[in-house]
């Protein structure tokens, strides 16, 4: 299991590429927001909905 953490202003291409490659390799991936909400906005306005909130 891999946890990929997201914060406001993340680099969209870098984050999405990592998640995509891991999932293609059949590795279980969870996207985790370290913000107060599961919806996190990247550096260029793209929004990602995380699977989990970091508490």
Residues covered by each model-derived region:
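Extended, subdomain-level signal for the structured scaffold at the beginning of enzyme domains
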Residues: 1-55
């Amino acid at each position: 299991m891999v946890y990929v953490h997201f914060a406001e202003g993340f680099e969209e291409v870098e984050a999405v590429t990592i998640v995509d490659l891991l999932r293609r390799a059949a590795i279980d991936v969870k996207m985790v927001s370290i913000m107060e909400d599961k919806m996190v906005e990247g550096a260029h306005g793209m929004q990602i909905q995380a699977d989990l909130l970091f508490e």
